[in-house]
Amino acid sequence: MTDSPLCGVIAAIATAIDATGEPNCAQSLALARFLLDNGCDGLNVLGTTGEGTSLSLRQRLAVMNAYAASGLPLRRLLVGTGAAALDDAVTLTGHAAALGFAGALVLPPFYYKGVSDDGLFATIEAIASATAAQPIPIYLYHFPAQSGLPWRVALIHRLLESFGERIAGLKDSSGDMDFANEAAGLSPRFRVFPATEAALPQARAGRFAGCISATANLNADLCARFYRSGDGAALAQAMAIRQLFDGKPLVPGVKALLAHIHDEPQWARVAPPLSPLAAADRTAAIAGYDAVRAKRVA
């Protein structure tokens, strides 16, 4: 297994949806190229912002195939492969490995709540065993507010002890920085990515590997200026864009602004059960974004 280079500013890239409810791979890939050319060190494909859990196994495999055929550098792409059904998670993770993605981001199997750490351990054990011939790095996706199941620090330690470098890191969408710091302290090689640009100062200092952020779809250039040169004004603007969605639905909000930024109204489509951003919220987000962008970073 080669060492994954994933670090820095990683956008949890949105997935374009066409009028029939299918992923629009061409539009998604155009955004991927734009983001990689404008500040992103990497991309997280088919995560929460990418609506991966709203897409079928067939659709997710098709999106992965499109990325693999695109010529984009898969060594910079992490792909969501978690699923409620273990066989689906194994299939997705194995396909990601065969295609050459840099890592597989694995949600816990999220339907049953209150399951034991032993059950979650067994899930990762099965995925790791099934992909042993092509040992893609596994990144744990910690988002208990959505999944209802945490990757507890003690369990992560157990996984590291059992599977070594296969357990490469963690995306932490909990917002609990104490947890993120504790997880980051488990091993020097265990890469932790909080899900907010606010963690970039600690990433620059070496505590975290970077961030994996939904709003990096919109502000990656600003995040990159801070991450690479310590430009505090750029980070302040990046955070101002993120804060436009405080108390609002994040994924519809990001997609509404993508429609505005790229002048492509179809970007505002979301897959059920999500709904497009309300008109008043969309107007406010656009006005707020334009106001932030009007303040040039020196």
Would you name each region that the model predicts?
Residues 28, 60, 64, 89, ...:
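A general structural signal for well-ordered alpha-helical segments in protein cores
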Residues 2, 161-162, 262:
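Short, conserved catalytic or adaptor-binding loops enriched in Gly and charged residues
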Residues 34, 66, 126, 158, ...:
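Alpha-helical scaffold segments in soluble metabolic enzymes
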Residues 11-14, 38, 207-208, 215-298:
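C-terminal alpha-helical cap/extension of soluble enzyme domains
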Residues 2-148, 167:
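Active-site beta->alpha loop and helix N-cap motifs at the rims of alpha/beta catalytic domains
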Residues 128-136, 143-249:
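Catalytic alpha/beta core domains of metabolic enzymes, predominantly
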Residues 21, 59, 181, 274, ...:
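Solvent-exposed, flexible loop/coil residues
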